UniProtKB/Swiss-Prot annotation:
Keyword Transit peptide (UniProt): yes
Biased composition annotated in UniProt, kind: Basic and acidic residues: 7-27
Motif Cx9C motif 2, residue range(s) on this chain: 53-63
Record protein name field: Cytochrome c oxidase-assembly factor cox-23, mitochondrial
GO terms, biological process: mitochondrial respiratory chain complex assembly
Disulphide-bonded residues: 32-63, 42-53
Native species: Neurospora crassa (strain ATCC 24698 / 74-OR23-1A / CBS 708.71 / DSM 1257 / FGSC 987)
Residue interval(s) of motif Cx9C motif 1: 32-42
Length: 82
């Protein structure tokens, strides 16, 4: 089974927050882009065999989950509803 890498960088940190808040509304920012790219590279290496890349998919899902939870938490602390 493929390894998702030992890098477990927090997706929503001060640097990411500043980038996210400073971007225009039409600009897309995904702090989990690196994890997404690793999963796509795994698919290419393994001729599209998703079972070989399940660790990478799980790492991406976990990254997105952490990112969304941290954003919600910061919005709650700031008193923003949306």
């Amino acid at each position: 089974m493929a390894q998702a890498g030992s890098e477990n960088k927090e997706p929503w940190n001060e640097e990411t927050r500043a980038k996210f808040e400073g971007k225009s509304r039409s600009e897309y920012l995904d702090p989990c882009q690196e994890a997404a790219q690793r999963s796509i590279r795994c698919l290419h290496r393994n001729q599209g065999d998703r079972t070989m890349c399940s660790d990478y998919f799980e790492a991406y899902r976990e990254c997105k989950k952490q990112w969304i939870e941290r954003r919600r938490e910061q919005k709650r602390k700031a008193g923003a509803l949306f």
